[in-house]
Each structure stands twice: as C-alpha cells, then as structure tokens.
Amino acid sequence: MNNQAYGVTPPISVANSTPKENELNDSLIKELKSRGSFESETATKKRVEVLNILQSMTEEFVYKVSIKKNISEGMARDVGGKIFTFGSYRLGVYGPGSDIDTLVVVPKHVSRNDFFEVFYELLKGRSELEEIAPVPDAFVPIIKIEFAGISIDLIFARLDIPRVPRDLTLDDKNLLKNIDEKDLRALNGTRVTDEILQLVPKPTVFKHALRCIKMWAQQRAVYGNIFGFPGGVAWAMLVARICQLYPNAVSAVIVEKFFHIYSQWAWPQPVLLKQIEDGPLQVRVWNPRLYALDRQHRMPVITPAYPSMCATHNITSSTQKVILSEFQRGIELMNDINVGKKSWSDLLERHDFFFRYKFYLCIVAATRSTYAEHLKYSGMVESKLRLLVQKLELVEGIELAHPYVKSFENGYYCDNAEEAHEIMNLYGTSKGDDRVKGVLHAENNDNNKENVENKVELHMTKLFIGLKLDLSKEGEKKLDIQYPCAEFFNICKGWQDFDSEKHFIQIKNVKLYDLSDDVYVDGETRPIKIAKRKRAVSKNEGKKKPKSVGTVSAA
C-alpha cells in the first residue's frame, strides 16, 4: 500500500483495489489495446534509436558552433548539449503515429540562429530525413521533421551555463535565470511533464488512466487548447490529481472517480498538483488575488513547475458547459459499466457534433496562393476562433456556441478567379460538394505543371461552431450576429501578413441538413430532411420561432 502523501490535500481513499475493480481494469486495458492505443515493441525501439541519433547530432551541432566561435578543440568536445522529450512521449502515453516533442538544450555560446542554420543543415544532410519545415517565428520557435518515418517537433533552449552534460536535469529553478522568454517557454514543456510524473503515486496506473481519458476526450471532441478545451498537458494534470486522491486505486477506478470528482468540482477553484512556488525570476506566476485576468479563468488547471501558469485559460462559457455535460455523460456510463449494462467502448463512442445542432456557423479561411502560405493564414484564423465564440456568447438568443476541435482542408485548381470565388462561396455545404465535382484537386496534382498552367490555385480551411438557440422571446424573429462576425473579420484582417488580394475570410450559416459530406466518417449516416406536408398558415404563424439564423455577411 502506498501511504506517501501526494498533492495539496490528504487522499480521499487509500483503499486497495477489489477483485471486481481489477477485472474492470483488465477489460479497460483490453479495450485500449483493441483500439490501437499501444505501440509495438519494435516501433518503440525505433523511437529510442532515433532519439539516440538526435542526441549525437545535438552534440555535433554544439561542437561545430563552438569551433566556429574559436573555442578550442578539447573544450568544444566537452561543452556537450542534450535532448529532452516532453508531451505524450515523455508521459508514456504515445501510440502508433504519435510525434515526439523534443527539446534541444545547449550552453550559452550557442544561439537560436545557430539552431536554425547549423542544426538545420546537419538534419538536411541525414539520409533518414524525409521532411523538414523550420518555423523560426512561431510563439515557440520550432523545426518540424519527419525522420526515419517518425514525426518530431524540435524546439530549442539556451541555458546561461558554459556546459550542458548528458546527466543534466532541468529541475533546478536557477537554470531559468538570464534566459529569454522563448527559452523559458521551451523549457517549460519538459519541466512540467517531469514534475507530473514525480507527483503521481503509481506512474503505470496514471499512464493507463490517461490513455483512456485522452482517447475519451478526443472521441468526444473536447480535446484542444486552441479551440477552448483542455489540451494534452491539462488532461494529464486532471488525471494526475485523481491519482493523488486515490493513491492505491487501479486505472479503471481512477477513470470512474475522474468523472465524479470533476462534475462536482467547485469551479473556478483551481486544480493543483502541489502548492504554487515562488522562484528567482521577475515573471508572472498564476495568482487570481493579484491579477484580474487570472480571476476570469473558468476551470483553472495549474502547471506544477515554476513559474506556474494556467493550462486552461482558453476555456469559455460554452466550452465549459460542453465539458461538464461530457463529465455527466461519463458518470452515467461508468455507473452502467460497473453493473455490466455498458462497456468501455460505449464510453469511448464518437461524438455526435454534426448531428446535434440545427444551425452551424461555417468559418472559411481561403488563400489564392500556395499551400505553404495558406497554412500560415489558416493557422492564424484557427487560433482566433475562440474569440469569435466568446463574442457569440454575448449575443441575446445564443444559449451555446460550441466550436468543433478540428478543421477540414481542401485545395483546387480553378479555371479563373470567378470559379474560385464561386467554389469559396459554397464551401462547407452540400451544394459545395456538387460544385467541385470535376475540379482538379490541388493535392492530387502530382506537381504536373502542364495541368495547372494558367489555373488559379485555391486552398481552403473550414471550421465549425454549433449554435444552440433560445429565441423564446415574444416577437423574436432573427438572430443578429453581424457585430461579432464583423469584429472577427477585423481581427483576421489585422494579421500582419494579410493581403486582401490573396486572403479571404467568410462566415456562413449552414443548417444541419446542408452540411458538407466530409464532416461525417465511414459508418455515419448523414441526417436527411424529411419533406413536410404543406399546411394552411395560421394567423399566429408570426409568433413561432424562426427557421433560420439569418444571413451572415461575408468578407
């Protein structure tokens, strides 16, 4: 029995698992395996081999830069350089096809420019490299690579120390001194994941429970920080807290308690894995007593590593309602699973987002240019979607503005600008599906320049918000969302690289029965509108609820 104290409060129960709970746990692991949650031993060994190569390359990178900066041969060999992992790989919850979040840590004489020049060239010289995409201007500068069949996100941090030996750990807060904000953000990922693993009583129990909750959150479409839902680190911390409260429980019990505890949680009381610490930096630490912005956080989940921050600051009124509703569904299903009425597969059933609402807003970001340029623009629009959600929540008549957590992309080569505009105007609807039949797909071009000469290249990304309306007020006819849409357009057009000749943004209202086919997956039958019989119009017709959201202007 594990009697060590974990967390900011005593445990709720230190009871060991019962035979029935162990049986339930076995069936959970079996379900996760059947859904491909675990990677093969061979694939995992390959990851380790690739990380060993990257470690050697990091040392070679630091050596080359050191020599270039007139450091002696002996010292250049000794200054080191080390890689750290973070995210799902470090937490031990990765699956087939998962990427590896990797941090390259270097001594003080190696710069970020060196990373994007010298290390970049070293990577390009490797036969294992399949793809490489440097993004030096990102919030956390990154080099994305496909290396020996594995996707890897490489970020960089320079420490204010002369050597980075292989046995260096990042738990000493003093290592954060005299570094810039980008370095601090880069180091934070590894420091947070390392602390989470140190703060759970039984790491294996935590990992299996997290695999389940992560899969549940993805299946139920409540996973994604950028869209106003918890991201991977936040879900990990939420699971870790339950592990602290039930230190001797098996993973199946952790999952059950997860839903019960968080559906009754006194939000906005924060979820903490340890007391918030002070440190040596003049940086802001999460503190709702001091900062008004921190008081606005609806479901705060606080990172354990200094400087502590809220990992769920993007949650809105609507996304909180959606999350709490999913917690309640989880409770009901766990009750049935416990008595054998339901199975784990019912808990992990796919969401019904594209069946749930009568009205949807389809936000279209379009670029008449290359796919690479479109990715930058559409990424910016995605990052701003939650701001539109927040503005819609203030509109009278909107009870819920529910963002979907994935985008859909398509590219076409159009005959002319008029055809491109027509396709754009219908994109996201069933009519749009019909319109593009026979139009050359940009992704299927195979770089055949003869096929696309004099064509207009068009790339589009669509995002969806489901609207739950309450138009019960007497005489309420229309929902006016012109103002929040206009504000959103202005935000997008305020992007520093916005070009009105190339970049376009639209918001259109689409009814359930008019959604495009690609939002449904194999096995789902899209809703079909049943034609109603015509009837006589009564004199009270004007008092009934409206049948549409009204027209939304496009920009």
Curated annotation (Swiss-Prot):
CDD domains (alphabetical): NT_PAP_TUTase
InterPro entries registered for this protein in UniProt: NT_sf, NuclTrfase_I-like_C, PolA_pol_cen_dom, PolA_pol_NTPase, PolA_pol_RNA-bd_dom, PolyA_polymerase
Cofactor needs: Mg(2+); Mn(2+)
E.C. number: 2.7.7.19
Biological process terms in GO annotation: co-transcriptional mRNA 3'-end processing, cleavage and polyadenylation pathway; nuclear mRNA surveillance of meiosis-specific transcripts; single-species biofilm formation on inanimate substrate
Cofactor descriptive note: Binds 2 magnesium ions. Also active with manganese.
Protein keywords: ATP-binding, Magnesium, Manganese, Metal-binding, mRNA processing, Nucleotide-binding, Nucleus, RNA-binding, Transferase
Annotated positions for site Interaction with RNA: F139, K144, H313, N314, R386, K391, E487
Binding positions (Mg(2+) 2): D99, D101, D153
Binding site for Mg(2+) 1: D99, D101
Ranges where the record places region Disordered: 1-20, 532-555
Catalytic activity, as annotated: RNA(n) + ATP = RNA(n)-3'-adenine ribonucleotide + diphosphate
Signal peptide: none
Keyword Metal-binding among UniProt keywords: yes
GO CC field: cleavage body; cytosol; Mei2 nuclear dot complex; mRNA cleavage and polyadenylation specificity factor complex; nuclear exosome focus; nucleus
Subcellular location: Nucleus
Residues engaged in binding ATP: F86, G87, S88, D99, I100, D101, D153, K214, Y223, G232, V233
GO terms assigned for molecular function: ATP binding; metal ion binding; poly(A) RNA polymerase activity; RNA binding
Pfam family, one: PAP_central
PANTHER family for this protein: POLY A POLYMERASE, POLYNUCLEOTIDE ADENYLYLTRANSFERASE
Function comment: Polymerase that creates the 3'-poly(A) tail of mRNA's. May acquire specificity through interaction with a cleavage and polyadenylation factor.
Family named by the database record: Belongs to the poly(A) polymerase family.
Other facts noted in the record for this chain: The C.albicans mating-type-like (MTL) locus contains, in addition to the genes for the regulatory proteins (MTLA1, MTLA2, MTLALPHA1 and MTLALPHA2), a and alpha idiomorphs of a phosphatidylinositol kinase (PIKA and PIKALPHA), a poly(A) polymerase (PAPA and PAPALPHA) and an oxysterol binding protein-like protein (OBPA and OBPALPHA).
Descriptive protein name: Poly(A) polymerase PAPa
Organism of provenance: Candida albicans (strain SC5314 / ATCC MYA-2876)
Gene: PAPA
